Amino acid sequence: MTPIPIPPRDQTPADSLVTLDGFKKLFGFVPNVFAVIAQSPHALAAFKGLQIPLEKTLNAGMRDRIALAVSEVNGCEYSVRAHSYIGVRLSKLDAAELEMSRYGGSNDPRTEAAVSFAKRVTETRGKIKETDLKVIRDAGWTDAQIIEIVCRTAQILYVNFVNNVFHTEIDFPLPEAIADEA
């Protein structure tokens, strides 16, 4: 299947342009995933509607780690590459630590509990066991924070599905290349 065509700026809905300009300012370019989603201003607003509140509760590194765990489960190479890049370049995380996050791991027990939980939620489609909740609670996460982790998981599921359905052309470097540059 061929990737969905990325429309030029002059063919992008006007209601999406301000958000895309924000992504361009942040990344230095408009990532293809957002150019794809921007074809529906409502879908782009839905993504942003989750992103802004979560930025206040989960730090950038945690959001990237969760994104990597969820994306690995979903086989979304675009998001794995994007969040590996973002994690190293913007969140200033160690590339090896990010690689561990892809599989639900971390050198920090509290972080590992959150990332592993997001992975488990994705694998089970939310039908986790009581022991899964016990592990994350025992690591110091409150129920409100656990809900925020579930929300981030759902946000990344949405982006993974867009990428997997439309075969979004990857415009981020391989994780190995990022690690070599860091």
Where on the chain are the PLM-derived regions?
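Hydrophobic alpha-helical segments
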Residues: 1-182
